[in-house]
Amino acid sequence: MENTEEGLPTDQHFHHDLVSSLPLEEGMSPVRLRKYQGVWMSEYFLVGTMNAQRYFKARPTDILLASYPKSGTTWLKALTFATMTRTRHSFGCHPLHHLNPHECVPLLDEIAGSLESLSEIDFASDPRLISTHLPLSLLPESIKSCGCRLIYVCREPKDTLVSRWHFHGKIVTNMGKSEELPFEKMFDMFCDDIMPSGSIWEHALGYWNEKTQTPGRVLFLKYEEMLEDPMGTLTRLAEFLGCPFTEEELRVGVPAEIVNLCSFGNLRDLAMQQNRRISPGGIMTTESYYRKGAAGDWRNHLSPEMADKLDQITAKKLQGTAKGGRQLQLRSCMDFGLPYAKTKDTDDLTQLATERGEAGRTQGQRKA
């Protein structure tokens, strides 16, 4: 790899130059979006994306956590990290007590922005636990070809939109900016796939198709089902990771300890105690990643017309995804009071019914 006099690889300069030449969208200011390989991406993560595509060497033992932004990433990171490291750390002095889940599981899209940071991953012991917000189409070829395991979490699009809008407000505040993004404008951009990481529908479809084409490689989780049954989710997660809970662990309540450690309330309280700035770029504070940790908040933001439009887009985007198997559904079965419905023949990404959700909240089932 040829170096310049400043020590920066020549292709690094090329990546920076390439980013500045890509189509620009500033409707989410101060977040600048660039269109790269057909996908709108945050400008901040583009050099890292390019570096990862060129230099990252995946291993068959790697575990990759993938998600569309604001779909349950923080919770998934905490659960996976705690499950994989449960024999190394006691719950009383666990790393999650003083580290944010995003500090425990690095985001490939960001750390690859520095080749020095990317090279440090090469020295990490197996199995490496890494996360990404990249759609499947933008993943490094080494990830696609090495056979490493992928864990994907998706969320009802309307709730994802609302969560992203609130998170954007935190970005504006933490950067000391005054721009306010009207919800209606973000709604239009969301419908047009002009969002960081592109289309939520194409994002989910990419990993869903990988799941159906390579059985056993992808664990496809749904945020709302995680909320409804965290213990069941944790059991599936541990089995997929190859470290199922032993009879002794079940007897002494290890799974319950992990669920409690990674609960929304506990992680939020820990984040408020930590009270410091972390990634991306030191912009966000530890508590910025926690708001409600619930399903159904879209009802407080979307008009019936907005909700109907998103549901129509979802139905159109996911039409024909069954292909002889189970169909991916991202549309809520609970739109404006319709009866909750779920069958064993479909994989529904459902929002919990209001009446069921109230019970879940009282039992502390709402998670980050």
Language-model features: locations:
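PAPS-dependent sulfotransferase catalytic domain
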Residues: 1-221, 240-241, 272-345, 352, ...
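Non-catalytic, well-ordered alpha-helical segments in soluble enzyme domains
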Residues: 86, 233-247
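Alpha-helix initiation and capping sites
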Residues: 201, 227-231, 252
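C-terminal, well-structured subdomains that either form a transmembrane helix-short loop-helix hairpin
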Residues: 220-233, 237
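Short, surface-exposed acidic
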Residues: 243-255, 326
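Short, intrinsically disordered C-terminal tails of secreted or membrane-associated proteins
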Residues: 359-363
